[in-house]
Amino acid sequence: MKNGVPFITMPKEFSASADITMAVQAGPRLVIDGSIPKLKEGIAARTAVGITRDGKVILLVTEGSPITLQELARRMKISRYEGGLECANAMAFDGGGSTQAYAKIKNFELSIDGISYITNGLAVFAK
């Protein structure tokens, strides 16, 4: 986040500064300014983060059915009316056996277990 605004950029274009409050490195990038780059083949469970055209941050974890990076990118990019998430930019985190998530928001609770022991994660808390 820079000045309270989330963004996704290339590592070579990133530079630490006082107005950066949080940064994570991951990849590959799935959607870059509305375009999908060439991505590796192969299906797996996936974890990703995207930023919609109106600045909302979406954390995504697939469950049940493995998916290719290309299909994940397509679903993150396309419109809500087409069943997508309308992300202008998105990137993948580690997937496969380490894909997992936990969320508890009011009366909603979600727990997706992975097969691998995870020592690092990304946490989101209310202000």
Question: What are these model-predicted stretches?
Answer:
Residues M1-K127:
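Gly/Ser/Thr/Pro-rich low-complexity, intrinsically disordered segments
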